């Protein structure tokens, strides 16, 4: 069985985080290529791109059902299609952003879902 995760992020939340913590927050949450891609655009698009990637990582954690350090995940593109890469595996991903919201939906294939333990 596959697992799906979805997350919605306010772009202003990411903007405020970066205004307060700057580069420290960027390198803690995003890979160098994610940062480079986002910062190729000027605000507000750069904030929207980062918010979408943040939402993708949150959606992945929800779908997986356990915490994962943000730096272990990376949003990558194959052509125009984004994927969330984790441990060398690419999970299908859909991203969208507009105004003050970014949303992500990720699908984790069955073989990547850890077995449940306990009752």
Regions found by a protein language model. Name each.
Residues 1-119:
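Core catalytic alpha/beta fold that binds nucleotide/phospho-ligands
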